[in-house]
């Protein structure tokens, strides 16, 4: 089984390779489409606190949210102080109070963390009872997912992430 990009691993250049892919036309097109979709969802969600865990490119996915308290949590130290990073965290133990977030956004994070089930349990812990989870990910049964399998591009970002089916 190919190795996943571990965005929480500072010792590798996996995160940098993923950012390079996102700067290419196909990556930019994907980011733009996801920004549009998320921009249609977030304004409909109300609350006091919205949290984006991880980043997937240069776009501000939270800009369309009406929620005023916006937090980005990264698993790697911020290299750029102007990046908007407000919180560093660990994927297996989020430093956020239980039942404190109204909305959590996970842009392709589950595909690249070492323990996605643990992260989902942590997200469930921090969400309020009627909170919302907004997730993005690659569909393994889409054309891109099948292309990945046929060409065995599993060693190159973003294709070396673990793609989860919608039914899962």
Segments (PLM) and residue ranges:
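Conserved class I S-adenosyl-L-methionine
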Residues: 132-163
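Class I SAM-dependent methyltransferase Rossmann-like catalytic core
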Residues: 1-44
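A short SAM/SAH-binding and catalytic strip from SAM-dependent methyltransferases
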Residues: 102-117
């Amino acid at each position: 089984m190919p190795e996943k990009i571990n965005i929480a691993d500072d010792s590798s250049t996996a995160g940098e390779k993923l950012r390079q892919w996102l700067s290419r036309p196909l990556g930019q097109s994907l980011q733009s489409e996801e920004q549009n979709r998320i921009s249609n969802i977030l304004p409909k969600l109300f609350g006091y606190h919205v949290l984006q865990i991880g980043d997937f490119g240069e776009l501000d996915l939270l800009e369309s949210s009406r929620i005023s308290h916006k937090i980005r949590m990264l698993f790697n130290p911020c290299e750029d102080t102007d990046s908007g990073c407000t919180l560093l965290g660990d994927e297996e133990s989020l430093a956020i109070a239980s039942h404190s977030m109204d909305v959590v956004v996970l842009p392709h994070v589950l595909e690249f963390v070492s323990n996605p089930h643990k992260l989902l349990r942590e997200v469930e812990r921090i969400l309020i009872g009627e909170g919302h989870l907004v997730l993005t990910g690659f569909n393994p049964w889409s054309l891109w997912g099948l292309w990945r399998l046929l060409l065995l591009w599993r060693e190159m970002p973003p294709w070396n992430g673990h793609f989860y089916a919608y039914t899962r």
